Amino acid sequence: MLKVTLICSDKNHPVFRWLHKWKVENEHNYIINLLTCIADITSEGDLLFLVSCSEIVTKKHRDMFQQCLVLHASDLPKNRGWSPHVWSILNGENDITLSLLEAEDKVDMGRIWKKAKIKLNGTELYDEINQKLFEGELQLISWACKNLSCVTPTQQDSSAANY
């Protein structure tokens, strides 16, 4: 059975309860750990997902997993850095792109596994934006678990990067 670890740095972050729900719904398919800190990793696994994780995962910890993946709310390589979807919305964009990428030493620089677009109609409130965002993140997590053995990641074009 696939061994999946999810890390969200703060139990009070709104996405944490969504991750817990995903864990409960998928425990019959995978062995799942939901943690708040890299130091809490006690064993190797297949997939490590970093969702609203404020820590940079060292190579030592990344090497404990077949893949270490980050969920990032921007159309990478554009809008690297923390919480870019907030700035996209404030700038009047009507959608959020979620990028699923490999974790590296440098933040948001890894190869891209998959992207997903979330449409906004412009009337959503905070909780409604979060719901769409978190549902999209969970879909990407499920997709990665099902497609681990057949993914061909693509390199980011660093010349198009901004922060």
Predicted regions and their residues:
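One-carbon transfer enzymes
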Residues: 1-163
